[in-house]
């Protein structure tokens, strides 16, 4: 580490203020918090900030449904979010809201600077308009029949059934998802940010070598497809900030949302003496700026955000650290299975430090998805934290307290072993710095194994029974306690609460510099249990509680929908059985068992996945519009059913040689047909 402390500003992506924090959100906040705590442990100055993303049509409409104002709703959500983050020991220096005066002023300033510098233009566009609610409709608030495959009840930007992308004006029989009314076309002036003007700068920033390779590669794809002007305005009614100098025009939520990073920091500066906003945000700042985000919002953070900052005279981020999604037990989080776990539900049943440790043990610097396997979670935390690390203290502390009045030996008996533990500091530091937390944990647990091996070989419980060996006993146990101290110093960024209890036990603060020399002749306190093992019954209770939460949420949603429609509809009401056909017509359809050899996303297609299918001696390529329901890696190797004699169809992205069968209403609620084991590729389905 450099002699002069670094000055860092670190952010997490802003949670949207219309729902609860869940364990997927917590991955990012735990990852960032571990990195921040490591930096602080090394003496660097860190300002760690976040805020709620509190604008947009969904918030406005949800507040209306609840019968409260948007301001009331986002205030309640903010309180809930902050309580959840505090429960997981996320050490934010400030948590704010994008619906703040600081954000209004900064967003307006950035917009006016962009406009002054020639990066804002306007033109008239035609949009669908809800005549009952008197509002323009975002794409996702229009539903109708797909113009391509004629599937009903599809969103206004793409079809969940066939994967076709289109504008909402192309829908057949479009309806407003807000009121059910038939929308009409209406012209409106919109404002655009000229992103293409920043292409050279963005390419240079991409090639700087600081971005993750996956992010840089994705940006290169976007450059090759051509950057487009970005619509930054929305029409009233809209919950957000009005555009300066314009009437009934509001900033699109994604313009003022990232400005929320600046606004939260400005709010912190205004209440912290000596903290200078300009020092961190001026164009030539020597401070460091890092954003932790999920892979679903890379586009906004790697293109629009740095371009907005460049165009308005502010500094750009040093890096954008991107992580993958969280799965549970190998599948996407499911409300019906109870694996869609809210942060608050987890905190009622389990120690947050367990999740912090497990996430750390599986995190790396790549954009990989992380699977929370609940059985492995239990075994790893109990084996590593309880059996290896905490047990190291408990098996030595009793002798020190009972036989030596809590005092460690004056002489340290194993300097070479201790130096081996201290020598690992540089390796572990580099792994923390580069966000290779999983490798850091492996280094730490390997040291824990060595420490326990030492205690096993010295067997203090045997020495304690032998006459005249008090000094040897004290020295053995003092070595064990000191090795535990080093391990807990390394673990302090991951498990701050356990570290605090350890500091109380050792009667000394854990510092990175402090481990250079062992504690000798030092008095420790009487040992108390530092950490409890995970009881599988608590995990079962958490899953059941999550199911109950989901059921209650669904019941409330269904009740609201029923009241809105005055009658609930069955699946057959929504999708009636087709007219009868003759058996010969059905027999003409050749359905076969297929094994999914490979599955991948289709660039520039919002809903399509591309499959290579083995149908028993022949491989078929098929495109299917189920991307919103599955990740490609979830499907590879599975058996499914396909229509094999469907005439090949040439699509924009290639030839589709059949159709995969799936059931469900669409969106994320789609399920491919999966035959039982025993069925083989190529078998006919009768």
From Swiss-Prot:
Domain called tRNA-binding: residue spans: 585-686
Keyword line: Aminoacyl-tRNA synthetase, ATP-binding, Cytoplasm, Ligase, Metal-binding, Nucleotide-binding, Protein biosynthesis, RNA-binding, tRNA-binding, Zinc
PROSITE patterns documented for this protein: AA_TRNA_LIGASE_I, TRBD
GO MF, any single term: tRNA binding
Motif 'HIGH' region: positions: 15-25
Pfam family membership, one: tRNA_bind
Source organism, top-level taxon: Bacteria
Catalytic activities: tRNA(Met) + L-methionine + ATP = L-methionyl-tRNA(Met) + AMP + diphosphate
Binding-site list for Zn(2+): 146, 149, 159, 162
Record keyword Cytoplasm present: yes
CDD domains reported for this sequence: Anticodon_Ia_Met, MetRS_core, tRNA_bind_EcMetRS_like
Presence of the UniProt keyword Aminoacyl-tRNA synthetase in the record: yes
Name this polypeptide is given: Methionine--tRNA ligase
Organism: Vibrio campbellii (strain ATCC BAA-1116)
